[in-house]
Design a protein with these regions (language model features):
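C-terminal substrate-binding subdomain of Rossmann-fold SDR/epimerase-dehydratase oxidoreductases
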Residues: 192, 198-326
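Short, flexible, glycine-rich and Lys/Arg-enriched loop motifs at helix boundaries
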Residues: 38, 168-189, 199-220
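Short capping/connector residues at structural and topological boundaries
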Residues: 46, 124-125, 133, 139, ...
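Glycine-centered small-residue hotspots that permit tight backbone geometry or close packing
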Residues: 8, 36-38, 50, 79, ...
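Short-chain dehydrogenase/reductase
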Residues: 89, 137-145, 179-191, 221-222
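N-terminal Rossmann-like NAD(P)+-binding domain of SDR-like oxidoreductases, especially those catalyzing
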Residues: 1-173
Length: 326
């Protein structure tokens, strides 16, 4: 299979690339390196530096003939999206529409979208399945929902199929240590906790300790990035075999609280990991946990590496070098 990853130099993208490479697929990566790292791109990949907002660059790379496209090129900080909506609409929505229309033009008919559990918003029941209403509580989540809706329309109007993978919280690193480059400017909880443990930042801000959860801190569904990467392989195989659309959750179906992650990190790293408890963030639900039964049924996907110990241990391996320098 010949697969092109847009945004393939980022944290998730490099793990997805590795998964395709390890089964001897041909992999191209298109990235503007705004958050990804050139050093994390495997030498076996063909790298194209470019921006999805540049239609000519997108058209040129798609003209080289690909079986499938994986779209991971998006800004993803929910809080920032509320402060800078234009940044998110331009890159996430306009950029995606350029990519989708150019895929149609180039007759690349198999499209895998990196979507998000943020499309659901505040859960009205748990675990959250794909039939749950979509009502994003931040603009980032809206951009992902907007892309999904456009894919749905394009698939009806053109000969075009897609799988939208609604990730829950991606976490962890390749367990064999093949990814060593850190994510630039991480906003997600676990890399931030690791930066505190490694001495790269003074403390962790814990937003809210008065939620209706066992320890009062927010509960999320963390899924190991190696498991997420496998989901993209299975999605590509599904598209090439079935030529049908699919929207599925990728989550571990287990909830971990901020406090659990903090305690496990302290235990595994032996570091103090200072935490400061502050007010809740607007729009943050108390608990968000996935049902991934549809992904198992349609793709044969399971979260095999997503225990809190596996996630923290694999991430700490990568951050230990930084810890030695502090």
């Amino acid at each position: 299979m010949k697969v092109l990853l847009f945004g393939g130099a980022g944290y998730i993208g490099t793990h997805v690339a590795l998964a395709f490479l390890e089964r001897n697929d041909t992999v191209g990566i298109f990235d503007n390196l705004s958050s990804g790292l050139r050093s994390n791109i495997d030498d076996r990949c063909q790298f194209y530096e470019g921006d999805i907002l540049n239609r000519e660059q997108v058209r040129e790379v798609l003209s080289q003939g690909w079986d499938a496209v994986v779209h991971l090129a998006a800004f993803k900080a929910a809080g920032e999206s509320m402060l800078k909506p234009f940044k998110y609409s331009e890159n996430n929505i306009t950029g995606s529409l350029i990519l989708i229309t150019e895929c149609v033009r180039a007759e690349v008919r198999n499209f895998i979208l990196s979507s998000s559990a943020a499309v659901y918003g505040e859960p009205s029941y748990l675990p959250v399945d794909e039939k749950h209403p979509t009502n994003p509580t931040n603009y980032y989540g809206y951009t992902k929902l907007c892309i999904e809706e456009n894919l749905k329309w394009y698939s009806q109007l053109k000969e075009f199929n897609y799988v939208a993978l609604r990730y829950f919280n991606a976490a962890g690193y390749d367990q064999d240590g093949k990814m060593l480059g850190l994510e630039n400017n991480p906003a997600n909880l676990i890399p931030v906790v690791m930066e505190v443990a490694a001495g790269l930042r003074p403390n962790l801000l814990v937003f809210g300790r008065d939620y209706d959860t066992p320890d009062g801190t927010g509960v999320r569904d963390y899924v190991h990035v190696t498991d997420l990467a496998k989901g993209h392989l299975l999605a590509a195989d599904y598209l090439l075999k079935n030529h049908k659309n699919l929207v599925v959750n990728l989550g571990s179906e287990a909830g971990l609280s901020v406090q659990q992650i903090l305690d496990t990190t302290r235990e595994i790293t032996g570091k103090e990991v200072a935490a400061q408890y502050v007010e809740r963030r607007p729009g943050d639900p108390a608990k968000l946990v996935a049902s991934s039964k549809l992904a198992k049924k349609e793709l044969g996907w399971e979260a095999l590496h997503s225990s809190v110990e596996s996630i923290v241990t694999s991430t700490w391996k990568v951050y230990q070098e930084q810890a030695k320098q502090h």
